[in-house]
Amino acid sequence: MKKFLALALALVMALSLAACGKKADDNNKGNGDEAKGSVYYLNFKPEADKAWQDLAKTYTEKTGVEVKVVTAASGQYDTMLTSELDKSAPPTMFQVGNQGAVNSYGDFCYPLDNTDVMKEMTTQDFNLKNANGETVSIGYCYEAYGIIVNKALLKQAGYEITDITNFESLKKVADDIHARANELGFDAFSSAGLEGSSSWRFSGHLANMPLFYEFRDDNVTSQPATIKGTYLDNFKNVWDLYTTDSATTGAALTTATGDTSEAEFGQGKAVFFQNGSWEYANLVTSDDKGFKMNPEDLAMIPIYCGVEGEEKSGLCCGTENCWDVNKNAKEEDIQATLDFMKWVVTSDEGTTMLAEQFGPCPFKNAKTPENVFFADANAYTAAGNYIVTWAFNWTPAVDDWRAGVVDALTQYTVNGGSWDNVKTAFVDGWATQYAKENG
């Protein structure tokens, strides 16, 4: 943790990256030779699909090299990646975002040490390696998430951002706004939808809170076979708040999508919206969405959940965005992919897109993003607040584990089930998935 915080301050913000692997045996790969093959990128983030499609088109126009971008549906990346890698024309470029995925996909990952794209990196300290010590997955951006706040609406309700410093004060403000929703014309929280395009925010990102604090207390430094669920009551605190102080409650949560929640916030119908720095472009600059929110009205605060000392917490910082190259692809396609990756991180077009869509990137030519959420993350760190790292990167069989948590949350929230079922899905589900993944 000390090393992490030190690096975070040195880099302005932490870069918590993930990876996978195989031995580097051809140092000529990615050293600038003209690619003769083609690129097939299986993209992880639906919200960045248009940006990647546009960039791919630009690269093809400039070089003549075909770049195909396919984007998996939210929550379906692992399933689609497994299927696509088995095809005769598999992805040449894909994403592996945590240590568990290293175990699953390591045999497909090309060693990236000594390639040009890796030489462009400003830090390699958080690039994960395989069992042989080879770097096979590089993190291309750093992200932060928390509770996004519409400060203008908050002020209309009679509050300032400084009034919220912990769970108690967050609940007090949210309860009051919800009670006056008809009068104010807006509610406290946007929909905490349990539909697939939204549920990852809670089975993954909100679930990180109890995992982070448990791992911090127990000095966990590698993927554990079991967890205790020490802070699940704190998870419940926030979940109950999200699903009570909102216009969308009960059965409606099962069909509320990520777009639904985003639109409620973007259209000024809610003060609070749990999401991340990647939402900035959608909220502020997107012509497609049409929100065009004023950046000065936006802020991001920590996810407060009632843990002692949380007044000194910062935002949740890290990344699941890590590039991998398919070592089983054709030689010319591997070369084309490495050349494309280098162009993305060095060209004006590529670095502009990365800054706008993803924020801070660990490359020499990276542009400084205008994203106000990173300014908030920096401010918390500069004030000495601790960073809430991405403990969920150690989740075993992540899609299956999260699906179990979502099912239990649905039973609890919609059907009046017991919170004990959520605890079972969380704790026992972890042990079950770990055993399946590790034999």
What residue spans do the PLM features occupy?
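Hinge/lid segment of periplasmic solute-binding proteins
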Residues: 97-149, 201, 205, 295-302
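Extracytoplasmic "Venus flytrap"/periplasmic binding protein-like
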Residues: 58-124, 152-158, 165, 264, ...
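A structural signal for short loop-to-beta-strand junctions that line the ligand-binding cleft
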Residues: 84, 91-92, 118-154, 187, ...
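Extracytoplasmic/periplasmic substrate-recognition and gating elements
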Residues: 62, 156-157, 288-356
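Extracytoplasmic/periplasmic solute-binding protein
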Residues: 136-140, 145, 171-224, 270
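C-terminal capping/gating helix-and-loop segments adjacent to ligand/active sites or protein-protein/ligand interfaces
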Residues: 139, 356-363, 378-434
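Short, solvent-exposed loop/beta-turn-alpha elements that line the ligand-binding surface or hinge
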Residues: 113-126, 193, 211-237, 287-293, ...
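Glycine-centered hinge/linker elements that transmit conformational signals in sensory
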Residues: 174-175, 221-255
